[in-house]
UniProtKB/Swiss-Prot annotation:
GO terms for molecular function: ATP binding; protein serine kinase activity; protein serine/threonine kinase activity. This is Wall-associated receptor kinase-like 21. ATP binds at L320, G321, T322, G323, A324, Y325, G326, T327, V328, K342. Keywords: ATP-binding, Glycoprotein, Kinase, Membrane, Nucleotide-binding, Serine/threonine-protein kinase, Signal, Transferase, Transmembrane, Transmembrane helix. It is found in: Membrane. GO terms for cellular component: membrane. Residues 1-21 form the signal peptide. The gene is WAKL21. The chain crosses the membrane at residues 248-268. It is a single-pass type I membrane protein. PANTHER family: LEAF RUST 10 DISEASE-RESISTANCE LOCUS RECEPTOR-LIKE PROTEIN KINASE-LIKE 1.4, PROTEIN KINASE DOMAIN-CONTAINING PROTEIN. The active site is at D439. It is an enzyme of class 2 (transferase).
Length: 622
């Protein structure tokens, strides 16, 4: 992504000629702004704007009008620290008010946290991204969607009910963009549609006001253009000139077209209702993601065009892999940075929950062996996540020889196990409340240029109980990947840090054996790798599960370290969680195994460096 000052939210500030679909006799102009009835710059118009002598723009109070449509007015709200909340009163008028939907008011100095929208913009974002260094008060979100049953916000709810002193800015949202510094207003004329002043061939839309009253808007029907209100001219039918159509052909096909039209209308009605439902769901999703993005200043926001360009329009040649929840593509931004972009397969609530969860968790932790979330994108109900690119794929791909590279040496396997354990231990012990990954598996362990491991895919992760509480687990429905799932968690629905320990134990067995976790070509009692490993290790038959690819380099010291790792895996795979070690204990055991195998710390790095160099000389980086 180019280094421009917009990595969090899309800043959209328009200054252009303003027009509306409802026409009237003549128009009024204020330098750069052209308006038509019912909008104007004098008392003779129902909805009056002022004309800025400095910019030549239409303004409402002190706020510039950016756009006027058949139903809305968009105004610019520049981010300002400690702007009095009562400044918003300028946008509550007899014929206009902020829309209840697709709007979020950003406020400061609140006595209590607003419950309607759980989002908070950190001071770091305000200071660094908006260049407002003196803005010390945190910014929170006031979502107008729950304030009233009307179509517009209530001034009393915003000014008095919010308990906030300052109005920082606003956010308006559409299906394809999130706009900071922009507020959407609804407009109307007095009276209900029953007392309409709409012209012939115009439809009336009612507007429910916050005081219980009604307003209305007039719009020319589809196929008509002109003046929707009762002023001279009215709405007239649009005339399209068509050449080369014979009159008799038109008459002959008219009957057929009428029949087809009836069928089309019925089908269109069905799909339109479904589309409305989907559109409403997308709007709800967008509002949720919007708050998450606004509340996580460490997560940049990319546009869909940037994502599309980076992946070459999601070309198959850039596809890195696909899973249950989405497809991952390799991408490259203009600054030549390589990234991995996950495109979710589904747009349902479950998928969105996982996106929100991953944004929250990855933006709150940092560790060299956790994959970094570089940004995200939301376009028309479809979320995308942008990660750092891991050129050597996944641990699973190497253990299953899917990349055409030499088998991983024992030194590399042991190093990957140690790094992965360190990352999980960090999530369990260095974060409060702890984070339980819930999907530790070899395909979620990525490898960088130097084969350092990084854990990915936090969509199923959950926060544990804070260390201030004595509870050892949380109750939740089991989720994860078959073969890696803690059997006791599956039995009693109690998730704890020991659930990740079990999954990591399965990964250790994969590292030793190179076997698939679930393999139906094995005997029935050995389909599950964990069951097979527990049986063989318990009977002292570790040699039965050692990867044949390791036979060429095996020696007494290496054989001893494999046995020690197998015994550690055996403890991790205990059915009862209380019998399993903690991740901190596992990292300590792995450190001892490394020292036994390498002899010294310096020898460890020398051996790894030599192995990595040989691999990189034989096989070019992807």
């Amino acid at each position: 992504m180019a280094e421009t000052p917009q990595p969090y939210l899309i800043f959209v500030f328009f200054v252009f000629t303003l027009t509306v679909a409802t026409q009237t006799t003549g128009s009024v102009k204020c330098k750069t702004s052209l308006l038509r009835y019912p909008f104007g710059f004098s008392d003779g118009y129902p909805i009056r704007f002022n004309c800025s002598e400095i910019t030549g723009e239409a303004v409402i109070g002190e706020f510039a009008v950016q756009e006027v449509t058949n139903s809305n007015i968009y105004v610019e709200i520049p981010p300002v620290c400690k702007r009095n909340i009562r400044k918003i009163e300028q946008l509550f008028r007899e014929n206009l008010a902020p829309s209840k939907l697709q709007n979020i008011i950003l406020v400061q100095g609140c006595k209590k946290q607003n419950k309607s929208s759980n989002c908070l913009i950190r001071n770091k974002f305000v200071e660094n991204r908006l260049n407002l260094s003196k803005c010390k008060s945190p910014v929170s979100c006031l979502d107008g969607a729950t304030t009233t049953t009307a179509d517009v916000m209530s001034l009393g709810d915003v000014v008095n009910g919010s308990g906030c002193k300052y109005w920082f800015s606003s956010i308006s949202q559409s299906q394809v963009s999130v706009n900071l510094g922009r507020l959407k207003l609804d407009w109307w004329l007095k009276g209900s549609c029953s007392n309409t002043t709409c012209s012939e061939n115009a439809d009336c839309a009612k507007v429910k006001l916050d005081d219980g009253g009604l307003g209305h808007r007039c719009t020319c029907r589809e196929g008509f253009s002109g003046k929707a209100f009762t002023v001279p001219g009215g709405c007239h039918r649009l005339v399209y000139k068509r050449k080369g159509l014979h009159k008799l052909v038109v008459l002959g096909t008219a009957g057929i077209l009428v029949g087809v039209l009836v069928i089309v209308v019925l089908i269109a009605t069905y799909f339109f209702r479904n589309k409305q439902s989907a559109s409403s769901e997308r709007a709800s999703i967008a509002n949720r993601l919007l708050c998450e993005l606004a509340g996580n200043s460490s997560v940049p926001f990319y546009t869909y065009k940037e994502i599309e360009k980076a992946t070459d329009s999601f070309s198959d040649k850039n596809m890195l892999g696909t899973g249950a929840y989405g497809t991952v593509y390799a991408g490259e931004f203009p600054n030549s940075s390589c990234v991995a972009i996950k495109r979710l397969k589904h747009k349902d609530t479950t998928s969105i929950d996982q996106v929100v969860n991953e944004i929250k968790l990855l933006s709150s932790v940092s560790h060299p062996n956790l994959v970094r979330l570089l940004g995200c994108c939301f376009a028309d109900g479809e979320p995308f996540l942008v990660y750092e690119f891991m050129p050597n794929g996944t641990l699973y791909q190497h253990l299953q020889h899917e990349r055409g590279q030499p088998p991983l040496s024992w030194q590399l396997r042991l190093a990957i196990a140690c790094q992965t354990a360190n990352a999980i231990a960090h999530l369990h012990s260095s974060v409060n409340p702890p984070i339980y990954h819930r999907d530790i598996k070899s395909s979620n362990i990525l490898l960088d240029h130097e084969f350092n491991s990084k854990i990915s895919d936090f969509g199923l992760s959950r926060l544990g109980m804070s260390t201030d509480f004595e509870a050892s687990h949380i109750s939740t429905a089991p989720q994860g990947t078959p073969g890696y799932l803690d059997p006791q968690y599956h039995q009693d629905f109690q998730l704890s840090d020991k659930s990740d320990v079990y999954s990591f134990g399965v990964v250790l067995v994969e590292i030793i054996s190179g076997f698939k976790v679930i393999d139906f070509t094995r005997p029935y009692s050995e389909v599950n790798l964990a069951s097979l490993a527990v049986d063989r290790i318990g009977r002292g038959r570790v040699v039965d599960i050692i990867d044949p690819c390791l036979n060429k380099e095996i020696n007494p010291k290496m054989f001893a370290s494999i046995h020690n790792l197998a015994e550690l895996a055996f403890r991790c795979l205990s059915f009862h969680r209380n019998m399993r070690p903690t991740m901190v204990e596992i990292t300590e055991d792995l450190h001892r195994i490394k020292l036994m195998h390498y002899g010294t710390e310096s020898g460890k790095f020398k051996n790894r460096s030599e192995i990595d160099m040989k691999r990189q000389q034989s096989f070019p980086r992807e």
